[in-house]
């Protein structure tokens, strides 16, 4: 943090300065022609700065990496590495992936595959823990169930970010009855 402040205050050189580019400010919806001072993998400041390396961005646009907050890599029918090549090329640098389709077919082996595979991608991938395996109680996946106790060890994994979507109207109905939640109350709130 101290290095960022020193660069921003002009007391230290940035590692890289992107010169003369157009910065897309996604918060204010403005496009500003300015320089971007970078130290390490962080933006230190915008404005007139000097750096150890300068990249001329004349006529180019500089934007933050995009974040896809909910997606299913396996729906693209490619590996995480192959998916990331296309996503990164279009500006997506971070995704939150729910691998429930793969996990519903392969069980924990599918989840383990996904966690191992995302390590080799050039983007940040957070895995959301599939919450409904199998997805319905009228279909069996052959790989068994993943219950809360099965999820516990995965919560220690830094790549597992949270709990994924709850699927299936019948499952919701069963859970509401099991825990005495009024289905009528839920229907009126939906």
Residue ranges of each PLM-predicted region?
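Divalent metal-coordination and catalytic microenvironments
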Residues: 21, 41, 59, 70, ...
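Di-metal (Zn2+ and/or Mg2+/Mn2+) metal-binding site signature of metallo-dependent hydrolases
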Residues: 60-82
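Conserved protein kinase catalytic core
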Residues: 26, 64, 74-76, 97, ...
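Glycine-rich, phosphate-binding/catalytic loops in enzymes
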Residues: 54-55, 83-85
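Generic detector of well-ordered alpha-helical packing
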Residues: 26, 57, 69-71, 75, ...
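Divalent-metal coordination cores built from histidine and acidic residues
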Residues: 4-7, 84-190
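Histidine-rich, glycine-flanked metal-binding segment
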Residues: 1-64
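Hydrophobic "anchor" residues on beta-strands that sit immediately upstream
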Residues: 16, 64-66, 94, 161
């Amino acid at each position: 943090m101290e290095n960022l402040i020193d660069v921003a205050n002009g007391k230290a050189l940035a590692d890289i300065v992107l010169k003369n580019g157009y910065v897309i400010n996604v918060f204010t919806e403005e496009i500003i022609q300015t320089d971007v001072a970078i130290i390490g993998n962080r933006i230190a400041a915008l404005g007139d700065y000097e750096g150890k390396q300068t990249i001329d961005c004349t006529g180019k646009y500089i934007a933050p990496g995009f974040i896809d907050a909910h997606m299913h890599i396996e729906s693209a029918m490619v590996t995480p590495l192959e998916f990331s090549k296309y996503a990164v090329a279009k500006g997506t640098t971070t995704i939150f992936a729910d691998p429930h389709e793969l996990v519903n077919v392969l069980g924990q082996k599918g989840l383990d595959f996904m966690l191992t595979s995302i390590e080799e991608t050039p983007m940040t991938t957070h895995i959301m823990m599939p919450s409904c395996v199998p997805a319905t109680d009228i279909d069996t996946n052959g790989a068994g169930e993943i219950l809360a106790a099965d999820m516990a060890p995965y919560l220690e994994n830094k790549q597992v970010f949270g709990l994924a979507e709850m699927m299936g109207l019948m499952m919701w109905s069963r859970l509401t009855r099991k825990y005495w939640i009024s289905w009528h109350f839920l229907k009126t709130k939906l």
